[in-house]
Amino acid sequence: MESPLGSDLARLVRIWRALIDHRLKPLELTQTHWVTLHNIHQLPPDQSQIQLAKAIGIEQPSLVRTLDQLEEKGLISRQTCASDRRAKRIKLTEKAEPLISEMEAVINKTRAEILHGISAEELEQLIKLIAKLEHNIIELQAKG
């Protein structure tokens, strides 16, 4: 009997995300908030919403909802771009900086606990296998 690999991977992502959401709850944030803030923090300053959506790998309407929530919490600001009034530039606020450090600590601790008992070699092999799967899927999508 073949393994339902797609279902297994989807379930893994779902329970991993639920654990991160649970652990970020005391900070009143979610895994989606973390991914967005982390990417804003890592990317060069004044990224547009379009650039950020591409970096995260999501559609812009999904990102806008998350950015609305983060702006409501006072963690980001959005300014209209002078050269293109349709584009908005995203900046972290001063309030976000210490929170990002707290979030990183939660994420790093959780990741270490999840990977407990998995050797560096096993992890490296898993990363390579995931990259191969992703490559194959992208090639299949390109073929149509």
Curated annotation (Swiss-Prot):
Domain HTH marR-type stretches: 2-135
Protein's GO biological process: response to stress
Record carries keyword Transferase: no
Example GO molecular function: DNA binding
Cross-referenced Gene3D superfamilies: Winged helix-like DNA-binding domain superfamily/Winged helix DNA-binding domain
Keyword Plastid part of the UniProt annotation: no
DNA-binding region per Swiss-Prot/TrEMBL record: 49-72
Pfam family, one: MarR
Key words of the record: Activator, DNA-binding, Repressor, Transcription, Transcription regulation
InterPro entries for the chain: HTH_MarR-typ, MarR/SlyA-like, Tscrpt_reg_MarR-type_CS, Tscrpt_reg_SlyA, WH-like_DNA-bd_sf, WH_DNA-bd_sf
Function: Transcription regulator that can specifically activate or repress expression of target genes.
Homology family: Belongs to the SlyA family.
Xref: NCBIfam families: PRK03573.1 (NF002926)
Subunit structure of this chain's protein: Homodimer.
Protein name, per record: Transcriptional regulator SlyA
Organism: Escherichia coli O45:K1 (strain S88 / ExPEC)
Lineage: Bacteria, Pseudomonadati, Pseudomonadota, Gammaproteobacteria, Enterobacterales
